[in-house]
From Swiss-Prot:
GO molecular function, one term: metal ion binding
Record organism: Streptomyces violaceoruber
Swiss-Prot/TrEMBL keywords: Carbohydrate metabolism, Cytoplasm, Isomerase, Magnesium, Metal-binding, Xylose metabolism
Reaction catalysed by this enzyme: alpha-D-xylose = alpha-D-xylulofuranose
Subunit structure as annotated in this protein's UniProt entry: Homotetramer.
Name of this protein: Xylose isomerase
Coiled-coil positions: none
One Gene Ontology cellular component: cytoplasm
Cofactor: Mg(2+)
Subcellular location: Cytoplasm
Amino acid sequence: GVTFHDDDLIPF
């Protein structure tokens, strides 16, 4: 959910 991960599981 941060950059391209809509799951917010990865801080990338």
